[in-house]
Amino acid sequence: MKWILLVFGSVCLLDVVEDSFVHGKRNARTVTFSRTGRGQSRRRRDTWTTEKERFTECNTPLSVKDRELLRSHTHETGFHGDDGSSFTLTWAGNGTGIIFVLSTISVPSDSFYEGGSSRLYRSEDYGKSFHDISHAINNTFLNSYFGISAGHGNPQPVILTANLPFTKDPGGKIFTSMDAGLTFRSVQLQFHPAQAIQFSLLDPKYLVVISIDDGLWLSEDFGNNWSKVHEGVHTFTWGSENTLFFSSSPNGTVEAARRGELILRRTCDFGKTFDTIAENIFSFGHIGSFLFTSVMEKLGSPRVIYVSKDQGDHFKRAQLPSATTEQFYSVLDADEDMIFMHVDNPGEDTYYGTVYASDEQGILYSKSLERHLFGGEGKSDFTNITSLRGVYLTNILEEGGCIRSVISFNRGGRWRYLKKPENVDCPDMSKKCNLHIHGEHSHFSGVTPMTPSSEPTAIGLVIGHGSVGDSISAARPDVYVSRDGGYTWWGTLRGPHHYSILDSGGLIVAVEARRDRGISSIKFSTDEGQCWKTFNFTDHPFFLAGLASEPSSSTMNISIFGYRLDDNHKPMWVAVTIDFEHLLTRECNDQDYVTWLAHSNYSSNPKTDGCLLGYKETFRRLKTLSACRNGRGYVVSRQQSPCICTSEDFMCDYGFYWHENSSACLPQPDFLNQTQDFCLNVDLQTTGYRRIPGDKCKGSFSPPRNEEAHQKLCGNVTSSDSHTEIPPAILALIVVCSLGIICLVIIAAYMITSRRINCGQRSPEYNFSVLQIQEDDLSVNNESTPNGKLNGFQVQEDSDDVSLIKQ
């Protein structure tokens, strides 16, 4: 059975886009588990359609010695008497072993209780034991959404935010700690925070937050004292160094209906002075080196994107299709060199759009992928495979309603279908047969418990849920793994699982995802998912909530959270932490590693084999059969060498698209009329190709030149390339006539100026109707582009991105 788009339901995309944009992505240091279901609209995990087995899972027995060794390093904690409906885990620092667990239970607002209740636990041994420290904060009820904020640095700063009834208390309360929670200091606030307190990236003593009345509050002494520096603030984000960007209403209050009139402001001295760098914006964001905005240049016109790469000093309009009120933009991914932008397809609830890739300035965009899936709930499957440079994975919606997976190995320059796993048979040989990977859509809908996973230190390793066939299937998904960044795949686990990459890829753990019964065992692999061993970690099964491990993939501890009935037949939270470090005791040596050329297709040309974006990368990676420990100090070893330029180093230029049948970049018909304004201001010389941003290739290779490309794109705007020769006699006559005209203009200007000086007291007469139209146009333009600058929108990021811009 095929999975079609109907599973997305009728969720309003714009509302979800708004929420995702304001609140940002899930903190990489924080994970939340819940005992409640994900909603009736989600798919139950016991209602999948069934299909025959496509592959056989490889399992090897666990020796008695290893089983006893793991059992002696398995630690179970039962949170007796805790009736919290959700558990939120937050790690303090990297490699510290310190974890905070916030248990909360909320009650309806009309209940006779005030708010709800919470408990705070702390572990300093990677979750092997937890201690209730609620008394350290006087058993104060903490906010269930942003109760814990952990900053970077040593000592580890931690801030707890209380959940006080704002109808009774004039201000909120926080608890601050500079010793990772050993001690806390209570601070009474003058305001109620509306979101999590944000730390400065340079100095954790500098804090910023928005209050429930839209005030922007700053602290320069780690929360002891606060100053309200601005009113009517909608959202904010930190820029480079101590730069803070925020959008605000010109009238001091934020109204959703007036979001097209927001002002973008900037402060570089923690609120002492402000610069207005843009006006009339809808939203803004900062990711990588780019600051960008969504703007309506004229009343009633579609919205457009403006981009700055100098922290807001100057903005330029991005050459992208405009978006109507039914459409939206979404920044899928960005770094220092490039932006991937999704532009929604025209029409209501189309659930797909086009992905564009920018140049290094973020101004010119090339069409990278059409019919890119973007569901009504505001979720995109666009995934950066962090274990191998230049690799991106996503899904497209074909015209028949089928969803298929595609992958790019050169930063969106070319896309292709995924290869069928070597150990998997095709269900129907008469149809297309490829691997299709479930993404965020499936995770949100309850089809899969996790999204694809990769880690920068686990070179080439990718693991995710998928199905094999002509499109994504509604059947029970299996787990597939790739060890070369997505070029080839292997069926590794039958059925859906929770999984985690540990020890920089030297260890993978997985727990079967079930809702119909409890779990008691964990699977682990030391050969990149080729085979698995099973360890029973408890004699008392419990219902799985999820896995949790330190944000760094170098850890060898995994915590399994769930719940079961206690002796009084009440739900009880359970945490089981397994330390695999005592199983893999041998440190890896030189003999355990092998040299591996990334992106190699084993071609006959050694000069170009493995070349990607202008250079090769050779890694020293762990051998598949080496059962040893990389360790916390493991650093990826790589060697880079330059490559000569080939066609793979180029992508289609602005206004062109890749035509599969001709294998060439051809002009986009729908862009011919949209480029005229740009051509008037920029000498857009193009052959239809441009080098991929960040590409470092060397050599004299040039893509095939299309002599008519520029003329088709800019029409008759450019005349510098004209080859029409003018006879010398006619040219001399033109020069003489031009000089004569210039002299006449100078004389006339002198006479008019003299007359105006003599008649300075006269009242001028104007054509008011014409003048008013001109002033209205100028007024809108001046507000949209003050002093040649323009506006920006927020991407809250803990690493990666990606966020949404409501249009």
Model feature map: region roles:
Residues K2-Q807:
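Extracellular glycan-interacting surfaces
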